[in-house]
């Protein structure tokens, strides 16, 4: 009975994690280039249950009853890198990638440490010094480092990521792709960073100027999954309440027999 209580408890924890992921997806449904996440669950290893003190069998032999599952545990959260739809902005600072690859960004944390992060959010602008930056002020990287432009002159970006101004090629966007996206992890609101053993490869993405990639979150689908998760959570709650009532009866009344 106590094992059943524990099984319901692990179910609650699992559904809560799933709900947190779904809620975060919905919160980022309007975030440019956001990739939705999902949650997995795994069962604990089954264990053998034994019948003890059975006078019908030899007292020295425990009889197997079968297997007993100890509930579920949280598996891994994963990212769905499916490309989102494009929307037209007609703003030449807005860039979108069609195909595999990420914009490279120079990120500085609160401690002043500098590292390269990756994003599909191409909503860029110029800072006061004329550098191309993200909405958070992080520098967008080209093949030669930070990208500096003349704010008083128009510029263009071709499909290969070449940036030109005054009929002169300035630099090329540093678009990075990875051999295995399982070696990427979410960082902050809308960045990704490689983990150990991540390997880069040449990106095959096409750059579109004046467009932004929307998130790949399907709001209706996420809401349906939230309802399903909520029902599963309620079921586990009721199971715990049932076990609690049964244990209370066992402790208060069976002792009187």
Give the ranges of each region predicted by the language model.
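Amphipathic alpha-helical polymerization modules
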Residues: 1-257
């Amino acid at each position: 009975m106590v094992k059943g209580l524990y099984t319901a408890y692990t179910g609650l924890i699992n559904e809560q994690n799933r709900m947190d992921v779904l809620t975060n997806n919905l919160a980022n449904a309007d975030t440019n280039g956001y990739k939705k996440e999902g949650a997995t669950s795994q069962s604990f290893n089954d264990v053998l249950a034994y019948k003890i003190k059975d006078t019908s069998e030899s007292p020295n032999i425990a009889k197997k009853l079968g297997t007993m599952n100890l509930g579920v545990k949280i598996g891994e959260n994963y990212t769905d890198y499916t490309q989102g739809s494009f929307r037209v902005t007609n703003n030449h600072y807005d860039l979108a990638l069609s195909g595999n690859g990420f914009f490279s960004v120079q990120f500085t944390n609160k401690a002043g440490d500098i590292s390269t992060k990756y994003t599909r959010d191409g909503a860029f602008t110029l800072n006061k010094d004329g550098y191309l930056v993200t909405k958070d002020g992080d520098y967008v990287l080209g093949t030669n480092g930070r990208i500096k432009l003349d704010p008083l002159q128009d510029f263009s970006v071709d499909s290969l990521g070449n940036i030109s101004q005054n009929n002169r090629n300035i630099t090329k966007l540093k678009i990075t792709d990875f051999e295995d996206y399982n070696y990427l992890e979410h960082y902050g609101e809308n960045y990704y960073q490689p983990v150990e053993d991540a390997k880069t490869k040449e990106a095959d993405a096409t750059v579109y100027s004046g467009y932004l990639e929307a998130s790949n979150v399907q709001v209706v689908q996420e809401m349906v999954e939230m309802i399903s998760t909520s029902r599963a959570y309620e079921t586990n709650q009721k199971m715990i309440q049932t076990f609690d009532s049964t244990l209370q009866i066992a402790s208060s009344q069976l002792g009187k027999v």
